[in-house]
């Protein structure tokens, strides 16, 4: 983005055309605005050399260095910028590279992301790049519960090789239910706590109410 912005500024000055914009850089700005609407006006500062961006927090707009953002925010910005760059190269004939077609593979989309971002990342990708097909891997229940079962594949390695199947349900499930029903966790609690709870229920089943009460308190 440093070099591209330099070229954009040189063209403006050389041609005295201050409405000129670089197509690739403009596409990056547009994609970030769609994908991360709380951010705007990403730009380069020369003294000291850095990349700044405006972020709206609780209704107030503040300017931050990109280095001040969380790892998740930086990863998402880098990912979106890289997709746009590749879309621009692959579709030079399009006035809007974000409408280009492509197949995009992303491994472990949830890495470094806050649960709020894990929840929204797939829908924001498909809204920002509507003509692209995304093949995404994840271990996050927050991602899975926001994907329709027809678009979700559970992969398991068996003695016969790799098995792929749609779950019976995914969209709208709680994170705990996804972990237990789709990802094989027997409990989301610490194992020792689960064992203690099971022991209490067993005492109640045996009508050992006093012992059960002592175990609780």
What are these regions (language model features)?
Residues 34-38, 86, 150, 185, ...:
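Phosphate/oxyanion-binding loops and surfaces in catalytic or ligand/nucleic-acid-binding neighborhoods
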Residues 1-74, 81-98:
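Extended helical coiled-coil dimerization/tether regions that scaffold
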Residues 167-217:
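Acidic, Mg2+-coordinating catalytic modules of nucleic-acid enzymes
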Residues 15-22, 112, 187, 206:
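Charge-dense, low-complexity intrinsically disordered segments
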Residues 52-183, 192:
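Switch/communication elements of ASCE P-loop NTPase nucleotide-binding domains
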Residues 13-17, 64, 163-164, 185, ...:
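Residue-level detector of alpha-helix boundaries and kinks
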């Amino acid at each position: 983005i440093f070099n591209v912005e330099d070229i954009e500024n040189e063209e403006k000055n050389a041609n005295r055309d201050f409405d000129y914009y670089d197509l690739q850089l403009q596409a990056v700005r547009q994609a970030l605005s769609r994908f991360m609407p709380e951010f705007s006006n990403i730009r380069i500062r020369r003294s000291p050399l850095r990349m700044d961006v405006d972020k709206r927090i609780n209704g107030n707009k503040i300017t931050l260095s990109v280095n001040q953002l969380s790892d998740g925010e930086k990863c998402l910005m880098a990912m979106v910028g890289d997709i746009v760059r590749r879309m621009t190269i692959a579709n030079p004939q399009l006035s809007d590279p974000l409408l280009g077609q492509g197949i995009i593979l992303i491994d472990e989309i949830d890495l470094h992301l806050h649960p709020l971002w894990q929840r929204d990342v797939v829908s924001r990708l498909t809204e920002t790049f509507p003509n692209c097909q995304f093949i995404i891997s994840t271990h996050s229940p927050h991602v899975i519960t926001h994907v329709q079962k027809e678009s979700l594949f559970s992969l398991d390695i068996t003695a016969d090789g790799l098995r792929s199947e749609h779950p019976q349900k995914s969209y709208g499930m709680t994170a705990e239910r996804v972990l237990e029903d789709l990802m094989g966790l027997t409990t989301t609690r610490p194992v020792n706590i689960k064992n203690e709870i099971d022991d209490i229920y067993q005492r109640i089943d045996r009508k050992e109410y006093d012992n059960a009460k002592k175990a609780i308190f």
